[in-house]
Amino acid sequence: MKDQITHLPDNADRSVAKQKFKITNWPTYNKALINRGSITFWLDDEAIQAWYESATLSSRGRPQRYSDLAITTVLVIKRVFRLTLRAAQGFIDSIFSLMNVPLRCPDYSCVSRRAKSVNVSFKTPTRGEIAHLVIDSTGLKVFGEGEWKVKKHGQERRRIWRKLHLAVDSKTHEIICADLSLNNVTDSEAFPGLIRQTHRKIRAASADGAYDTRLCHDELRRKKISALIPPRKGAGYWPGEYADRNRAVANQRMTGSNARWKWTTDYNRRSIAETAMYRVKQLFGGSLTLRDYDGQVAEAMALVRALNKMTKAGMPESVRIA
């Protein structure tokens, strides 16, 4: 954080020239980009060795043939290569054949059914304190026309969306928490369940003005996290226990906007959450294909798992040059 407000430049509220950066780890990052297209990067030894479910004598009912990891792997490959379930089945079977591995891909109907109950793990083995967690949400389309058709001919059929909520470590770009909700669930309503997914110590959390509610601030206070949420225009003071918010309100009243407060608190690091949303749309598209809501949750978490795997493989490190 910046220690003194006097360091704020006079033109902080005005737009500035676009900064230029140079990637300092290009060879490593370039190799990571190439590896994203390798099938063995996604269908690795861990998945192959745990492809079939281990038999357990204590369980009741018909045992599952394929493990949760196998179903998760199929969903991840489906998202990464943008395949249908049937195409993913044929694709994976052909890979097993070329690798001379005595395995079979789960039938597409099996994947569709198991997706409703599978637990897709997307968390990385990273541990320790998180200095700054940034939070945002975006919409993923389930049903409806494309943007171009709507622009040219208007909206003809109902459009259905789901909201993907992400909490991202601003230092590592890893997605720490993720959730999928119906479109009518507000960001602030989804926030408590999202932040409770991690038990790691968090110093500060940034979110936009949509999260400026008692519900969100109470959850951050409960977890002893510093709240970096800009108050809405004309916001009033809350009771004394909401010290973080009251300081932001005082700054807003003193300066007439939240600009100075954002600069002095490093709130603008929240743009990393927007970067994560951009990566989701660019790498995997902005839609979900499974029809059942529980299946859509699994599909979204598979997408998050894939993005974390890409992040762990290598991210660009840059320095400002202009």
Regions found by a protein language model. Give the residues of each.
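Polybasic low-complexity intrinsically disordered regions
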Residues: T56-T72, V76, V80-R86, G90, ...
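Acidic, contiguous segments within the catalytic cores of piggyBac-derived transposases
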Residues: K31-I34, S38-S54, A248, S257-A273, ...
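Short, motif-level signal for alpha-helix interfacial/capping segments enriched in acidic residues
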Residues: M1-T6, R113-V118, V185-A190, A250-G256
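Short arginine-rich
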Residues: M99-P102, K309
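Charged, often Cys/His-bearing segments associated with DNA-binding zinc-finger transcription factors
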Residues: M1-R60, R65, T73, L103, ...
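Helix-centered, glycine/charged polyanion-binding patches within enzymatic domains
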Residues: H7, R14-K18, G209-Q282, L290
